[in-house]
Amino acid sequence: MNKGPRHRPKFLSKKGKKLRIMVAGSSYTSYQACINSLCSKQILEAETEIDPLKAHIDRILEIREFNADILEDEFHVDLTVIEVNGFGDKIDNSASFEVVTHYLESQFDQALIEESKIKRNSKFTDTRVDALLYFIAPRGHCLSEFDLEAMKRFSKRVNVIPVIGNSNAFTEEELKNFKDVIMKDLKQCNIKVFDFPWDPEEDEDEVIEDNKRLWESVPFAVSGGVSEEDEEGYQRIVKKFQWGTFVIDDPAHSDFLNLKTVLFISHLDILKSITKQTYYENYRTEKLSNDSPSNTSLSLQKQNSIVANEDKRSVNGSERTETRSSIDQSEMRTNVSDSTKSEELKKINSIKVDNTSSLKCDSYGNTKTKTNQLNCEQIGLEVISPKEFPHRTTSSRNSLPNNTTKELEMKKMDDLSHERYENLPFYR
């Protein structure tokens, strides 16, 4: 009879190796009791009592974390158990996939953000999930569509380890047949679970044989129980029934010891390495490739244009101020000139109104008024009539017409004195 794990480390770490495992499965699998038995302490609490008044209400899907420091003779592990409470307990469980997948990807996002920083945080806590224990209900026929879809989605982001809960419900032959059906369904649906990889060129023969034996045990058939001493004084995890006692950590009864060895001793580092080098790198590649270069270039061009516009605003701010001041000054001058012109136009219009209101004829038949003359004197204009224009000799502009008139008068007098009437138009 196997009393414990086969793999024993050479030394134990004082702080314990960090391990983060997620547990998903319906409440009918009794996964809480199994996890408590693996950790040898009470971590998860199963709901043994159900309120009849709330039995018809769907349970809320919750993701809860529990920490436990597990120290035994063979290992020391700083364990974090992530429980998906209420998984698969609803009538419609379609939204459960997205909740779990979003949680797994969120842990990758945190690592990606920290990795892209120029100055990284030395105290950054890696929260990526190293393994997911998917508990399968002991139906005995085949995997449900829900189980197949769940493992297919989760296997893209984490190491999925299928586990049969409450395996004590099967006989030895029934359990073997159920395992064969599960592995056949996984293969037909191309669902990749943790397959205990080995390298024939690097790994020793003993390691290869152990990995093959563990792979043949998948899915692991386990149950939960309580610890008590047997007749020989060994601490055993048992589950008592009326027909007898089911020894959980007996390899002849269940795969409990194999699962415990895989998680805490033999494959702990391998699980963490595959999480970082395979699942995280695949997610990182998908995340960066989804950001198309065209969108990235457009966003960069937009940012550059915004920066250029800001620079132009800062550089040309003074020029716009000077231009605006010059425009204001020109507008002021224009307003002054416009106001002056408007005043003159008002005066001229007032003159026209006065002329039309009170018209008088002078001795030459011209229309003159005192107001007209007064307004003309105010604006500096000289108003004369056509009849008095030839008789004006004071102005230099009238010198040419006055001289011409005198010559014509003298010529007329000469023609009359010599009786040259043909030159006089009024004698023809």
UniProtKB/Swiss-Prot annotation:
First-listed, main subcellular location of the protein, grouped into a coarse class: cytoplasm
A cellular component annotation (GO) from this entry: mating projection septin ring
GO molecular function list: GTP binding; GTPase activity; lipid binding; molecular adaptor activity
Matching InterPro entries: G_SEPTIN_dom (IPR030379), P-loop_NTPase (IPR027417), Septin (IPR016491)
UniProt KW Nucleotide-binding keyword: yes
Biased composition (Polar residues): 290-307, 326-339, 392-405
PROSITE patterns per record: G_SEPTIN
Chain positions covered by the region annotation G3 motif: 83-86
Localization terms from the record: Cytoplasm; Nucleus; Forespore membrane
G1 motif: annotated span: 25-32
GO biological process: cytoskeleton-dependent cytokinesis; protein localization; spore membrane bending pathway
Binding sites annotated in the UniProt record for GTP: 25-32, 86, 166-174, 224
Disordered, as annotated region: 287-345, 387-414
Residues annotated as domain Septin-type G: 15-290
Keywords: Cytoplasm, GTP-binding, Lipid-binding, Meiosis, Membrane, Nucleotide-binding, Nucleus, Sporulation
Keyword Nucleotide-binding assigned: yes
Membrane topology field: Peripheral membrane protein
Function in brief: Septin-like protein involved in the correct orientation of forespore membrane extension during sporulation. Binds phosphatidylinositol 4-phosphate.
Similarity field: Belongs to the TRAFAC class TrmE-Era-EngA-EngB-Septin-like GTPase superfamily. Septin GTPase family.
Assembly description: Component of the sporulation-specific septin complex composed of at least spn2, spn5, spn6 and spn7.
UniProt protein name: Septin homolog spn7
Organism from which the protein derives: Schizosaccharomyces pombe (strain 972 / ATCC 24843)
